[in-house]
From Swiss-Prot:
Region of interest called Disordered, as start-end residue ranges on this chain: 1-39, 61-104, 971-1027
Composition skew (Basic and acidic residues), residue ranges: 29-39, 79-89
Protein name: Chromatin-remodeling complex ATPase chain Iswi
Residue positions where Phosphoserine is found in the record: S67
Species: Drosophila melanogaster (Fruit fly)
Biased composition (Low complexity): 1-10, 984-999
Residue intervals of the Helicase C-terminal domain: 435-586
Residue stretches of biased makeup (Basic residues): 69-78
Signal peptide: none
GO cellular component: ACF complex; CHRAC; chromatin; ISWI-type complex; nucleus; NURF complex; polytene chromosome; RSF complex
Length: 1027
C-alpha cells in the first residue's frame, strides 16, 4: 500500500477532518466510474440477450422505455451540415461501408462464454458433480449477459457449493475478488462460513453477527478496511446495519431462502433494493409457490429495469381469463426460462436413495380426550353454527385442538403437581408419546439417528424432559437458541462417532439450510399447515452425503383435526406439484382456508370424541403399528394419485358449501348434502350428557346388601328454645355452665338414657355412668340463674357472624396479627373500634376455640410469607444500593445456575424493574410484563416479550435466590475481614474472659411470638367442652 493510500486509511479510521490526497480521491472516483460503467454495460447486454431469447420481452422493455429519463446537461447542438443531410435523406439507407463497419463491430463484440468441463481447480476438499458444474456454467452465462437469476434446485443438491464456485470464478478468472455480500438465515450463518473455508479457501469470507458492541468493533476493524472478499450476514443484520452496507459497491448480492423478499413492501425487501449491486442471485430450495404479484416482486428485484410495473405484469398474465390456457403456460415458460434453474433429486442425483415416508396413526389418551372435549364444549355454539363465526376465533379453536393432539401438558394446569415429576405420566397421557416411547428404542437398536421436528417449542420442552428420563443423548435447536449454541450442537451431532442419538428442532427454525445428513430417520411430531415446511425439515437428512435410506415417520392423531390438516396439506402439495412444476401459476385462492373449511375441520371427529370416555392408546407391538401405518399410507397415496387436477381443485373438507364431486356427501349416486339441508339439525354435534354412575360390581353390591349394620345411637335431646352460641363469639364461660345445666335437666324430664359409646373401649362404661349421673342429679334453673343467663347472653360478640370471623382470620393471615389497622379495613361491616375490641378478646381467649390448631397454623403461614417478603425486599434493597446506575451496572453471581434461556441483560432488567415496581405489589408481575413490552431495548427480543406473568415470576424467584446467596456471602466475608482487622488487646481481660468462656445469650423472642407459642401449647393440652 502506498503512503498516500495509508494516509487515506488512517484519516478514515481516526475520523479526522483532514482531506485525503488527490491520488486517493481520483482512485476512488475511478472505481466508482468503473462500477457505474459496468452496470450500464450490463443493462445493454441484458436487453440484447433477452430480445434474442424471445420477443416477449419487447413488451416489457417497450413499456419501460415509454417514459425516458430527462437527459442531463445542455442538448447537443446539431451542425448545419448534418441537419441538411438529415433533411435531404428520406430513404434512411445504409451505405456499404456503414454496413461493413456495423458487422465488424458485432463480430468483435461477440465473445465466447467460458465453460467448465470438470470441477474447477480453485475448488478444494472434493469434486463438484456434473449437474453442479452445469449449474455453475449457467450462472456464468447469466453473469456474462448481465442477467440476474434464481437458482432453485431442490433442497440438498448443493446450491451453496454452486454459489461459492461462482464467486470463486469471479476472483480467479475475472479478477473480481469482491466485495460480495451473502445474506442468509441466522441458523445457517456459520454453515456458510464453514463451506467457504472448506470448498474455496482462497475466498476470504467474514461473518457479521453479534450484539451492538461486537458489530461496531467488527465494522471498524474488519469491514471498513476491506481485507476480505465475501461478507456473510443475516436478514436482521442487513436491517440494523443498512447504513454501513449502503457504503459499498457490491459486485454480487446473494440471498439464500429468497422467498423472504417475495413481498416488495417488506422492510427487508425495501432495504436490499437500496444497496448498490452489479449482480444479484436468489437461492431457494422451495418451488415458486407464488401468486402473480409475488412472482413479479422477485423478477422486479432481479431486473427492475425490465419488470418495473406490477400492473402491466398482472394485465399481461390475466389469470382470470386464461388460467390453464396453453397460451399462458407458453408465456410463463418464456419469461422464466432465462432466469430460473431448477433440478430435482430424482432427475440428477441417482446415488441418493429416495426417502420413505410413513404415517403413524395414534389414538387419544383419556386426558387428551378430556381436554379435547373441554375445548369443543367451550365454543360449542360456534362448532354447531349457532354463535358468531369469526375467522380468528376458529383459528384459535384449531390451535387449541392441535395442542390437545400433541400433549395435554401444553395447557397450563394439566400436568399433575406440584411437585412436578418426570415419570411415566409423560408417556401414557399422550398417544404420540406412547408411540414414540416404543419407536425410539427400536431405532436406537437399529443404529439409526433421529431428527424430531415440532412446531411448538413448549412441546420440545416436554420431549427434553422425556429424553432426560429415558437417558437419550440429545441436541436441541429452536428460534431462541443462541447462535454459538446452534453451531456447537450441529457440529457435535455431525461429528464422527457422535454420541448424540436425537436432535430436536422446531420446524420453522430448524428446517432451513442446516445439514444433518448424519441422521437417517426424521420424525414429524406435528405437521405444518404449509407442506413445504415439512419437506424442508425432511431434507435436513435427505441430501447429498446421506449414505442410508432416509425414513420419515409422520405422527397423526386419528379422528381429530390433525388428520384433516395433513389431508389438506397433501392435496395442496400435489396441486402445487402439478401446476408449478409444469411452469404455471398457483391460483392463490386455493391456498386460503375459508371459515367453512376451518369449521368442518373442527367438527371432524367431534362426535367420536364426545361418545367415548376411555383411552384409544393400544398396547400393540411397534412392528404391528408400523405395518398398519404403512398400509394406510399406501392406501391414501393411491387415492390421491387417482385424483386429477380438476378434482384436486374442487377437493373440499366435507363442507356444505358449493363444491365439486369429491366430497364425502356423494355416496351411492345420491347427494346426501341435499338431504341434510332438509334436516335443521344435520350438523348438530350433541354434547356429552351427564350420566348416572351405575354400580355393576356384583360382589360389592351383595356385600353392601347383606351387611348387618349396627343402629346408630340416637341423638341426645336438647331444649327446644335454647339459644345458639358459637365459640368465636366469646361468651363468658359461666354461660356455658348454665346452658349445660339446662340441657341435663331437660334430658332428665324426658327420661333420656345415655347409650354406651363402643368407640371409647374400656372407658365406655365409666363415661356412660358419669353422663347419666349428671342427668339424674340435674336441677332446674332458678329465677336468679335464668336472669343471670339472660345477662350473660348480652355480653358476647353476638353481632359477629361466621363470615365476619373468617374475614378476621384471613386478614390476620394477610397482614400479620400486629397490623390491626389493615385487619380492621378488611373486615367488612365492622368499625375499627369493634375490630380492635374483638382482636383483644380473640388473642386472650383463642384457646377456647374448637379448631384453634388449624386457625393458628393458617395465621402463622401468612406471617411466614410476610417475613419472607420483607427479607426479599431487604435483599433487593441491599443489592441495588451497591450501584449508582443499577439498570446499567448491576451484575449477578450466577455460579452454576446461569441457564440458557435468559440473558444477563434480561435478568438485570427483571431485577431492577421488580425493585422499582415494588416486590410486594399485588399484580407486580403483570406490571413487569407490561414494562418489558414497553421497553425499547427489547423491541426485537421476542423471547422476553412472549413470557407470561407466571414464567416471569419463576425467573424472578430464581434471581432472588441468587441475590440472597450473594448477600449472605458478602456479609460473611465482611465479618471475617472485621475479625481479622480487630486488635487482639482491644478487649479488657474480664470481658475477654467472659466472651471466650460464656456462651452468648439466646435472642429473646418477640412478645407476639412468645404469645403465639403459649397459645399453641395451651391449645394442645386443653379440650373443648362438649355440649
Amino acid at each position: 500500500m502506498s503512503k498516500t493510500d495509508t494516509a487515506a486509511v488512517e484519516a478514515t479510521e481516526e475520523n479526522s477532518n483532514e482531506t485525503t490526497s488527490d491520488a486517493a480521491t481520483s482512485s476512488s472516483g475511478e472505481k466508482e466510474a468503473e462500477f457505474d460503467n459496468k452496470i450500464e454495460a450490463d443493462r445493454s447486454r441484458r436487453f440484447d440477450f433477452l430480445l434474442k431469447q424471445t420477443e416477449i420481452f419487447t413488451h416489457f422493455m417497450t413499456n419501460s422505455a415509454k417514459s425516458p429519463t430527462k437527459p442531463k446537461g445542455r442538448p447537443k447542438k446539431i451542425k448545419d451540415k448534418d441537419k441538411e443531410k438529415d433533411v435531404a435523406d428520406h430513404r434512411h439507407r445504409k451505405t456499404e461501408q456503414e454496413e461493413d463497419e456495423e458487422l465488424l463491430a458485432e463480430d468483435s463484440a461477440t465473445k465466447e462464454i467460458f465453460r467448465f468441463d470438470a470441477s474447477p481447480a480453485y475448488i478444494k476438499s472434493g469434486e463438484m458433480r456434473d449437474y453442479q458444474i452445469r449449474g455453475l456454467n449457467w450462472m456464468i452465462s447469466l453473469y456474462e449477459n448481465g442477467i440476474n437469476g434464481i437458482l432453485a434446485d431442490e433442497m440438498g443438491l448443493g446450491k451453496t457449493l454452486q454459489t461459492i464456485s461462482l464467486l470463486g470464478y469471479l476472483k480467479h478468472f475475472k479478477n473480481q475478488a469482491g466485495p460480495h455480500i451473502v445474506i442468509v438465515p441466522k441458523s445457517t450463518l456459520q454453515n456458510w462460513v464453514n463451506e467457504f473455508k472448506k470448498w474455496c479457501p482462497s475466498l476470504r469470507a467474514v461473518c457479521l453477527i453479534g450484539d451492538q458492541d461486537t458489530r461496531n468493533t467488527f465494522i471498524r476493524d474488519v469491514l471498513m478496511p476491506g481485507e476480505w472478499d465475501v461478507c456473510v450476514t443475516s436478514y436482521e443484520m442487513c436491517i440494523r446495519e443498512k447504513s454501513v452496507f449502503k457504503k459499498f459497491n457490491w459486485r454480487y448480492l446473494v440471498i439464500d431462502e429468497a422467498h423472504r423478499i417475495k413481498n416488495e413492501k417488506s422492510k427487508l425487501s425495501e432495504i436490499l433494493r437500496e444497496f448498490k449491486t452489479a449482480n444479484r442471485l436468489l437461492i431457494t430450495g422451495t418451488p415458486l409457490q407464488n401468486n402473480l404479484h409475488e412472482l413479479w416482486a422477485l423478477l422486479n428485484f432481479l431486473l427492475p429495469d425490465v419488470f418495473n410495473s406490477s400492473e402491466d405484469f398482472d394485465e399481461w398474465f390475466n389469470t382470470n381469463t386464461c388460467l390453464g390456457d396453453d397460451a399462458l403456460i407458453t408465456r410463463l415458460h418464456a419469461v422464466l426460462k432465462p432466469f430460473l434453474l431448477r433440478r430435482l433429486k430424482a432427475e440428477v442425483e441417482k446415488r441418493l436413495k429416495p426417502k420413505k415416508e410413513m404415517k403413524i396413526f395414534v389414538g387419544l389418551s383419556k386426558m387428551q380426550r378430556d381436554w379435547y372435549t373441554k375445548v369443543l364444549l367451550k365454543d360449542i355454539d360456534v362448532v354447531n353454527g349457532a354463535g358468531k363465526v369469526e375467522k380468528m376465533r376458529l383459528q384459535n379453536i384449531l390451535m387449541q385442538l392441535r395442542k390437545c393432539t400433541n400433549h395435554p401438558y401444553l395447557f397450563d394446569g394439566a400436568e399433575p403437581g406440584p411437585p412436578y415429576t418426570t415419570d411415566t405420566h409423560l408417556v401414557y397421557n399422550s398417544g404420540k408419546m406412547a408411540i414414540l416411547d416404543k419407536l425410539l428404542p427400536k431405532l436406537q437398536e437399529q443404529g439409526s439417528r433421529v431428527l424430531i421436528f415440532s412446531q411448538m417449542t413448549r412441546m420440545l420442552d416436554i420431549l427434553e424432559d422425556y429424553c432426560h428420563w429415558r437417558n437419550y443423548n440429545y441436541c436441541r435447536l429452536d428460534g431462541q437458541t443462541p447462535h454459538e449454541d446452534r453451531n456447537r450442537q450441529i457440529q457435535e451431532f455431525n461429528m464422527d462417532n457422535s454420541a448424540k442419538f436425537l436432535f430436536m428442532l422446531s420446524t420453522r427454525a430448524g428446517g432451513l439450510g442446516i445439514n444433518l445428513a448424519t441422521a437417517d430417520v426424521v420424525i414429524i411430531y406435528d405437521s405444518d399447515w404449509n407442506p413445504q415446511m415439512d419437506l424442508q425439515a425432511m431434507d435436513r437428512a435427505h441430501r447429498i452425503g446421506q449414505k442410508k435410506q432416509v425414513r420419515v415417520f409422520r405422527l397423526i392423531t386419528e379422528s381429530t383435526v390433525e388428520e384433516k390438516i395433513v389431508e389438506r396439506a397433501e392435496v395442496k402439495l400435489r396441486l402445487d406439484k402439478m401446476v408449478i412444476q409444469g411452469g404455471r401459476l398457483v391460483d392463490n385462492r386455493s391456498n386460503q382456508l375459508n371459515k367453512d373449511e376451518m369449521l368442518n375441520i373442527i367438527r371432524f371427529g367431534a362426535n367420536q370424541v364426545f361418545s367415548s370416555k376411555e383411552t384409544d392408546i393400544t398396547d400393540e407391538d411397534i412392528d404391528v403399528i408400523l405395518e398398519r401405518g404403512e398400509a394406510k399410507t399406501a392406501e391414501q397415496k393411491a387415492a390421491l394419485d387417482s385424483l386429477g387436477e380438476s378434482s384436486l381443485r374442487t377437493f373440499t373438507m366435507d363442507t356444505n358449501g358449493e363444491a365439486g364431486t369429491s366430497s364425502v356427501y356423494q355416496f351411492e349416486g345420491e347427494d346426501w348434502r341435499e338431504k341434510q339441508k332438509l334436516n335443521a339439525l344435520g350438523n348438530w354435534i350433541e354434547p356429552p350428557k351427564r350420566e348416572r354412575k351405575a354400580n355393576y360390581a356384583v360382589d360389592a353390591y351383595f356385600r353392601e346388601a347383606l351387611r348387618v349394620s349396627e343402629p346408630k345411637a340416637p341423638k341426645a335431646p336438647r331444649p327446644p328454645k335454647q339459644p345458639i352460641v358459637q365459640d368465636f363469639q366469646f361468651f363468658p364461660p359461666r354461660l356455658f355452665e348454665l346452658l349445660d345445666q339446662e340441657i341435663y335437666y331437660f334430658r332428665k324430664t324426658v327420661g333420656y338414657k345415655v347409650p354406651k359409646n363402643t368407640e371409647l373401649g374400656s372407658d365406655a362404661t365409666k363415661v356412660q355412668r358419669e353422663e347419666q349421673r349428671k342427668i339424674d342429679e340435674a336441677e332446674p334453673l332458678t329465677e336468679e340463674e335464668i336472669q343471670e343467663k339472660e345477662n350473660l347472653l348480652s355480653q358476647g360478640f353476638t353481632a359477629w357472624t361466621k363470615r365476619d370471623f373468617n374475614q378476621f382470620i384471613k386478614a390476620n393471615e394477610k397482614y400479620g396479627r400486629d397490623d390491626i389497622d389493615n385487619i380492621a379495613k378488611d373486615v367488612e361491616g365492622k368499625t375499627p373500634e369493634e375490630v380492635i375490641e374483638y382482636n383483644a378478646v380473640f388473642w386472650e381467649r383463642c384457646t377456647e376455640l374448637q379448631d384453634i390448631e388449624r386457625i393458628m397454623g393458617q395465621i402463622e403461614r401468612g406471617e411466614g410469607k410476610i417475613q419472607r417478603r420483607l427479607s426479599i425486599k431487604k435483599a433487593l434493597d441491599q443489592k441495588m444500593s451497591r450501584y449508582r446506575a443499577p439498570f446499567h451496572q448491576l451484575r449477578l453471581q450466577y455460579g452454576n445456575n446461569k441457564g440458557k434461556n435468559y440473558t444477563e441483560i434480561e435478568d438485570r432488567f427483571l431485577v431492577c424493574m421488580l425493585h422499582k415496581l415494588g416486590f410486594d405489589k399485588e399484580n407486580v408481575y403483570e406490571e413487569l410484563r407490561a414494562a418489558i413490552r414497553a421497553s425499547p431495548q427489547f423491541r426485537f427480543d421476542w423471547f422476553i416479550k412472549s413470557r407470561t406473568a407466571l414464567e416471569l415470576q419463576r425467573r424472578c424467584n430464581t434471581l432472588i435466590t441468587l441475590i440472597e446467596r450473594e448477600n449472605i456471602e458478602l456479609e460473611e466475608k465482611e465479618r471475617a475481614e472485621k475479625k481479622k482487622k480487630a486488635p487482639k488487646g482491644s478487649v479488657s481481660a474480664g470481658s475477654g474472659s467472659a466472651s471466650s468462656n460464656t456462651p452468648a445469650p439466646a435472642p429473646q423472642p418477640k412478645a407476639s411470638q412468645k404469645r403465639k407459642s403459649e397459645v399453641v401449647a395451651t391449645s394442645s393440652n386443653s379440650k373443648k367442652k362438649k355440649k
